[in-house]
A protein has these predicted regions:
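Extracytoplasmic ligand-binding site segments that recognize negatively charged/polar headgroups
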Residues: 33-193, 207
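Conserved C-terminal helix/tail region of periplasmic/extracytoplasmic solute-binding proteins
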Residues: 302-386
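Mature extracytoplasmic/periplasmic domains
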Residues: 237-316
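Extracytoplasmic/periplasmic substrate-binding proteins
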Residues: 175-239
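Tryptophan-centric aromatic hotspots in well-structured domains and transmembrane helices
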Residues: 10, 35, 88-90, 110-114, ...
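Solvent-exposed, polar/charged alpha-helical surfaces in well-ordered, non-transmembrane soluble domains
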Residues: 14-18, 38, 111, 164, ...
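Early extracytoplasmic/lumenal segment of secretory-pathway proteins
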Residues: 1-43, 346-349
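Loop/turn elements at helix/coil->beta-strand transitions in domains of secreted/extracellular proteins
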Residues: 2-4, 25-28, 118-122, 175-176, ...
Length: 386
């Protein structure tokens, strides 16, 4: 039967979540990020995906075991995440850089995001989770190097001490930050207005391709200290009306040819890991070989594939998923920290000047009101005398 698809886009995961949780919106399928999937399972907001597709093959097993394993780390009690969610796209957070002014060695070390050499030349993704992860990794880079703590432990540490450390580091970085970007980073990088952009790998793919068209060479790396890996996935909210159609749609999106078309359309990387995908992504013009055995299996231990889209196994080893903040108080503390970091753009001198100007304006308004009142009373007094 024919199914009409009504497509709606949200800029922020939490907006979609609120519409479902509070407004009981009857979306049949939504595609949130991994931490929202975790939250929705915890709040009993999802239906399990029925994989009885009749005569249609089940394409969901086409997903990479690596991604399935990562998703299942977020399972809640007896609720296995992969029973409720099917991964769609995935990627990393890292540094997009202009090769003419930034070396690969500089881009690889996240310490250079704090380097005064790059004053006002860096864009940061407008995402409190990604920025928190970066800052807390940088603050503990020596401990990571010594093996005292893992990237996963750090990025999921929401203690008061860790939040304070992250805030301190992000504020120290601010002289270098030209802006907090959600969608304009590619343009500014291509025009040379900024030299580095801490962003998502999918955005980096688009930026690299667009920059090449105008003769600008950009590249992307994951910091050697570590970073986060993320996933978006399909889920069926419990208020869905067309549950069967939703399940079939999710299965359809896991078909290899459809996955390839989606990758070509948006620049991000599908969670589907079939031989057809690998074959389509091999590029014999590349000089370097990558170990993608973690994703495609042992036969992909040395392949020529774009490392921006598919990171080498050694790169993935230094990445981890940032879990959801299970405690509302912890989430609130991080959001308040993020607000202070983004809002604290003014130095003390400017702040004092603003207070002085507004203070002077307030005094002037008070004096004007008083004088106006006195003139009014004086006129009344004169009328009475007449």
């Amino acid at each position: 039967e024919d199914i009409e698809i009504i497509y709606q886009v949200f800029d922020i995961n939490e907006v979609m979540l609120t519409k479902i949780e509070r407004g009981h919106e009857d979306y049949d399928v939504v595609c949130p990020s991994e931490y929202i999937i975790e939250r929705m399972i915890r709040k009993d907001m999802l239906l399990p995906i029925n994989r009885d597709f009749g005569n249609t093959p089940d394409y969901i097993p086409n997903l990479a075991p690596y991604i399935q394993d990562e998703l299942n780390k977020m399972s809640q009690g007896d609720k296995k995440v992969t029973d409720y969610a099917v991964a769609y796209m995935w990627g990393t957070a890292g540094t997009l850089y202009n090769t003419e002014v930034v070396t690969e060695e500089e881009a690889l070390e996240c310490a250079n995001l704090w380097n005064p050499k790059f004053n006002n030349k860096i864009l940061m993704k407008d995402s409190y989770r990604d920025c928190y992860g970066l800052a807390i990794i940088y603050a503990n880079k020596d401990r990571i190097a010594k093996g005292e703590v893992t990237v996963e432990q750090l990025m999921n540490d929401n203690s008061h001490e860790s939040i304070a450390k992250a805030e301190e580091q992000l504020k120290l970085m601010k002289p270098n930050i030209a802006g907090w970007e959600a969608d304009f980073g590619k343009e500014m990088m291509t025009k040379g207005k900024v030299w580095m952009n801490f962003t998502w790998s999918g955005d980096a793919v688009w930026a690299i391709e667009e920059a090449a068209e105008v003769g600008v060479e950009l590249d992307y790396v994951v910091p050697i200290e570590g970073s986060n890996v993320w996933f978006d996935g399909w889920v069926i909210p419990k208020y869905a009306r067309n549950v069967k159609a939703a399940s079939y749609f999710i299965n359809y999106m896991c078909r290899p040819d459809i996955a390839l078309r989606n990758m070509d359309a948006i620049g991000y990387v599908s969670a589907v890991a079939t031989p057809e995908i690998l074959e389509a992504k091999i590029d014999s013009t590349l000089e370097n070989y990558s170990d993608l055995s973690y994703f495609f299996g042992p036969e992909a231990d040395s392949v020529q594939v774009d490392p921006v889209q598919y990171p080498d196994k050694e790169v993935i080893k230094r990445c981890a998923v940032i879990r959801d903040f299970t405690n509302k108080e912890d989430l609130q503390k991080v959001l308040e920290m993020w607000s202070r970091v983004k809002g604290d753009n003014l130095n003390t001198g400017i702040v004092l000047l603003i207070f002085a100007v507004f203070g002077g304006l307030f005094v002037w308004l008070v004096i004007s009101k008083v004088n106006k009142y006195r003139r009014k009373m004086h006129r009344k007094h004169r009328r009475r005398r007449r």
